[in-house]
Amino acid sequence: MMAQQYKYNPTDYVDYLCESMMDFYAALPEGNALRLSGIWERIYFDTKQAMKEHFLSPAERDDIIAYYEELIPDA
């Protein structure tokens, strides 16, 4: 099995954001748009919290949520 390369390494981020990113990557092979959208919502709020706690800049947050949104297949 080849390892998939992703733009963001979850372990580079605060624990709660790392967890939601890892959940997203784990669900990605299934291609379930509804499930991925739910996890994306968690990433959305986790990045907002990380930004409030100064773990992310606003630009980093925007890039992360846009990247994960692009990975969700069309329903």
Regions found by a protein language model. Name each.
Residues 1-75:
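Acidic, Ser/Pro/Thr-rich low-complexity regulatory regions
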